[in-house]
Amino acid sequence: ITPDCPFIDPEIVDNVIEYFLKHSDKFDYVSNCHPPSYPDGLDLEIMHLFTLETAWKNSVDPIEREHTTTHIWKRPEIFRIGNVCMSEEKNLFMTERWTLDYPEDFEFTKQIYENLYHNGNIFLMDEILQFLSKRPEIKKINSHLCEYNSVH
């Protein structure tokens, strides 16, 4: 989970953690972003400590030094990689941008929080999707940036 992801959904986190724990003997690394299917900004990665240590020790590329897990998922011949997808028929990665990199992303984030966050409540992915379906003008604030959605 990275700091530019202000809408992390605890149910998605629980699902990916449960999958990793259930299959920890089969995978060194599990994410929900290789391949991506959730909205950009709901991505998370889980790995064994030895996997992270191996990546840290062997990463020489500057990108891999900044984004250590890149070393892992670019080497499926070395690391056993698992992924949790939304569903076979649903992929929101290139149509939903819920990350915080540009001023438009900040305005989008501000609008979501002003409309959905009240008295410390937690709101989830489905609530954001429902809200955006009723308020498409908010989705348009940063939709032109979806082409920049990426996984590090």
Where are these regions (language model features)?
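Active-site cores that bind ATP or allylic diphosphates and position pyrophosphate for catalysis
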Residues: 61, 65, 74
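Short helix-to-loop capping/linker segments positioned immediately adjacent to catalytic or ligand/cofactor-binding
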Residues: 37, 54-62, 119
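Active-site acidic Asp-centered loop
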Residues: 1-3
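A recurrent flexible, glycine/aromatic-enriched loop bordering the glycosyltransferase active site
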Residues: 32-43, 91-92
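Conserved nucleotide-sugar donor-binding
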Residues: 44-56, 103-107
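A conserved catalytic-core signature of glycosyltransferases
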Residues: 41-42, 47, 67, 95-96
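Conserved alpha/beta core of the MobA/IspD/sugar-nucleotide pyrophosphorylase nucleotidyltransferase superfamily
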Residues: 69-152
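Conserved donor-nucleotide/metal-binding helix-loop-beta segment in metal-dependent transferases, i.e.
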Residues: 5-37
